[in-house]
């Protein structure tokens, strides 16, 4: 087998393995979580998810939308630690925090 064809096949194999690895769920905690977020979000800053984009509409008199304080005990905020440290998550889920 000639060398260029071998290198192309080798590179294709590595890319396939890397693509599969991105879909595997892992636990990301502590410094590993921070470094992974920094690598994923290199062009954006890491921000906390907003509670709801609909919350601002409820103050405008939309009666069918609940108020932001509606049943606060039942609503549990889930953060990146809940989703990716306590439970395993994929890089796709982790990227939603960018």
UniProtKB/Swiss-Prot annotation:
Subunit: Heterodimer of a B chain and an A chain linked by two disulfide bonds.
Q: Which Pfam families match?
A: Insulin
Highest taxon in the source lineage: Eukaryota
Name recorded for this polypeptide = Bombyxin E-1
Q: What does this protein do?
A: PTTH is a brain peptide responsible for activation of prothoracic glands to produce ecdysone in insects.
Q: Which family does the similarity line name?
A: Belongs to the insulin family.
Q: Which residues carry this modification: Pyrrolidone carboxylic acid?
A: 20
Q: Which UniProt keywords apply?
A: Cleavage on pair of basic residues, Disulfide bond, Hormone, Pyrrolidone carboxylic acid, Secreted, Signal
Q: What else is known?
A: Silk worm has two kinds of PTTH: 4K-PTTH and 22K-PTTH; there are four forms of 4K-PTTH.
